[in-house]
Amino acid sequence: MSAAFLGNVVEKDIHKSSLIASITFALGMAGTGFFIYYGGQHKGSLLSLIGIYICYGFIMGIGLGTGYLSPVKTLMLWFQDKKGLATGLAVAGFGAAKAIASPIMQWLLGDNQNGEIYKMFFILAVVYFIMMFAGHILLAKPADWHEPSGDEKKPGIMEVLKTKPLTNYIGIWVMFYLNITCGLALISQEKMIVKCIGLAGSVGIISTVSAIFNAGGRLGFSAWADKMKDRNTIYKLIFILSIAFTAIVMLTGGIKNAEGNILLIIFVLALIFMVNAGYGGGFSNVPTLLSDHYGMGSISAIHGITLSAWAFAGLTGNQVASRVD
C-alpha cells in the first residue's frame, strides 16, 4: 500500500523517493535481523514479534513500494516509443529476483540450526543498500522533460482521472486486481502442486524456471504490447491463454492424475509457467496502459494508487487458493 500513498512523492522528486526507498528498505531489513536476534536472546518476547512486523512489514514495505515506482516513469520518458519494453525491463528485475535471490539466501542461511538467521538479514541489508543507492545516484529524467514548478498548478489525481469516464479507471483497476489475484492464487500453491505431480525433488528447479517465466512475461508481454494499437489486447490475450491452460489441466484431471504421466506433467508445468508469465505481464503493462489513457503528467501517482489492487490481491489471492480443493 505504500506505493498508493507515496505516489505523489515519487511524482514530485524521484531522487528523494529513490533515496527514501534505499534507506527504508535497508533499514527494515537490518531491523528485522536485529529483532530476530533479540527474539533468540529473549524467548517468547512479544517485543521481538512486534519489531519484526514493523521492520519487515511496514518499514521495508515503504522501501519496496517507493522503490518499485521510482524508475518506471523515468524509463518511459527516456524511451517514449518503446514504453512497454522500458517498463518491462524495469519490473523484470522484480520477477527475476526470485531466481537470483532465493539460492543466495539459501546459501547465506546455511545450517540455520545454529540460530544465526539474523546474520543473513544484516548482510542483505548492506548489499541491497549499496545496489539501491547506486540506482538512486544514476536515476535521472531526460533533460528535455519539463516538470511543473511550484508556481505552476498541477492537476490533482482525481482531476486527471476525470478526464475520462471514471468507469474507465475502475475497469483497469479491476482487471489488474483479477490478474494478480488469480496469479497469486496459483503461485502460492506452486510447491504443493509440484509435489502432487511427483516432482518433489525438483521443486527448487521448477521454482527458478517459473521465476524466469515471471520475468520473461514482464518483458515479453510489455514489449509485444508496444506493437498493438490497444494495450488492453495484451490483457485479453493473457486471460485467454491462462483460462485455456487451466481448462486443459482441469478437464484432464492433470494435478491429481499427473504422477507418472509425462503428458499430464507437461500440461501442469505449462499452466504454472503460463500463469507466472501472465502475472508478470499484468504488472509491466499497467503503467503504460495508464499513460496511454491519462498521459505522463501524473503517471507515478496514478500508478501508485492502481498498485493498491496488488495489495488487496495479496490479501485475497492466498485465501481464494486455500478454499479451493
PLM region spans:
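Intracellular juxtamembrane helix-capping segments at the cytosolic ends
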Residues: 65-79, 86-87, 280-294
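Helix-to-loop junctions at the C-terminal end of transmembrane segments
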Residues: 2-14, 218-230, 325
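Extracytoplasmic gate region of multi-pass secondary transporters
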Residues: 102, 165-223, 283, 287-290, ...
